[in-house]
Each structure stands twice: as C-alpha cells, then as structure tokens.
Regions:
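Exported/periplasmic ABC-transporter solute-binding proteins
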Residues: 1-32, 37-226
Length: 226
C-alpha cells in the first residue's frame, strides 16, 4: 500500500492512524512549493507570511496600499478545501485553521480546479478594473500551465516574492524560499523492505525515478541530480 502526497497528513489523520496502530513513513521524492500570484499589471512585488495570514485568516486588508502596493482593491481567491493547494495553504499559512469567514473570500471567489486558480485571477482585472486579485497554487503547475492549455502565466500574472525571496527552481531546491515543500511517498512504517511499495519508493529516488519526477513537472531532489 502506497500513497503519493503533496503534504504530510493532518494532525487529525495522524491521530486516526495512531489509534489504529499504524505509523506512517514519509519519503520525500520531489520538490515543489506554494506560490502566490497576482495580475501582471499590479506593481506589488511581494508579501510577507504575516500579511498572507492577515489576508486569508483575519480578512484584515481590502486595499493593496495596506501591504505596500498600489491604491487598488485587494481581491483574494482561494482553492476548494479538498485540493492539494489548499492542503499546503492549511499547513503553511492557516496553521491548520480556517479561511476568513467574511469578505471577498466568502463571496464566491473559490477556484475548484488548478486551471481556474490561474484563469480566475487573470480574469479578475477585466471584471473589477479598480483592483487586483491574488491567488495561490503549486509552483511546478504554475510553470507548466501553458502546456496544459492555460495560457495565462506569460503575460497576465506574476509570482509574488514571500518574505523577500522570489520562488525559483534554485530558491525552492535550497529551501531559501519560505514556502518550499516536498512531495512524498507515504508508506506504513512497517512496510517490508522487499515489498512492491518499498521498491517503488526506492525507484523514485533513483536517477531514473528522478527523471520521471522531472518529466512530470516537479523538481528533482538535489541528491539525485548528481
């Protein structure tokens, strides 16, 4: 039995596993990161994690000027709660809490697919020209969006630096980008060494497996690149 996961299990799931006498083992197989993006025309270049928490948890801002940007409406978009992007959001920004229950987030600004997470933010400028949207996704999806027929990343959106560090292959791999993350293979800790699940994990860490990771659009682990 094996599971591919973009984040570690929630505290609740870990407790359920423990109650069932199961210990989970997480084996990192690829790099990824959570990224935030806004309309290309927005002169704002970055936010802090604290500001993101104020936006999505406390609904503290409604204008980009409050976070060092232009005098323009701030329109936050979110993902559906059963998405991998939202799982990272819960872990890294919400601290396993909930989104704000007021403001624009509650008024329907929810993207239910990876593709619409990008197109919704890109189109927000057309429907609300007095403001700029902000949304989030995972880095390697954002980079490969054009090949998945979501032609918005090159000229309609730009990524925001977080705590002064812009997301890139290099800053995600070396961990300096603060929202860097790993993708995991998840096994039972007592999975036998000669089991198919354990052999799959070993393959994913081999040079051949890391090539599969790269072809799938994720970042290969440093130790597997050499």
């Amino acid at each position: 039995d094996v599971l591919f996961a973009a984040t570690k299990a929630s505290i609740e799931l870990e407790e359920q596993a423990k109650a069932a006498g199961v210990e989970l083992e997480y084996i990192p197989i690829a790099y990824d990161a959570m990224v935030f993006f806004t309309n290309e025309e927005n002169p704002a270049q970055g936010l802090t994690i604290g500001q993101l928490q104020d936006i999505y948890v406390r609904n503290a801002y409604d204008n980009w000027s409050q976070v060092g940007g232009p005098d323009a409406r701030l329109m936050p978009y979110c993902r559906n709660t059963d998405s991998g992007s939202h799982a990272l959001m819960e872990e890294m920004i919400l601290d396993h809490g909930a989104l704000s229950l007021s403001g624009d987030i509650l008024q329907g600004n929810m993207s239910t697919a990876m593709s619409t997470a990008l197109t919704d933010v890109a189109a927000a400028l057309e429907t609300s020209p007095a403001g700029y949207a902000i949304g989030y996704s995972v880095y390697y999806y954002y980079l490969t969006a054009e090949t998945m027929m979501v032609d918005v990343t090159d000229n309609r959106l730009h990524l925001l630096a977080i705590d002064g560090v812009a997301p890139s292959d290099e800053t995600i791999a070396d961990g300096s980008y603060p929202l860097s993350a790993c993708n995991y293979i998840v096994l039972r800790a007592d999975t036998p060494e000669d089991s198919p699940a354990r052999r799959l994990a070993e393959f994913m860490l081999s040079p051949e497996g890391q090539e599969v990771v790269t072809r799938a659009g994720f970042g290969a682990l440093q130790q597997a690149k050499g």
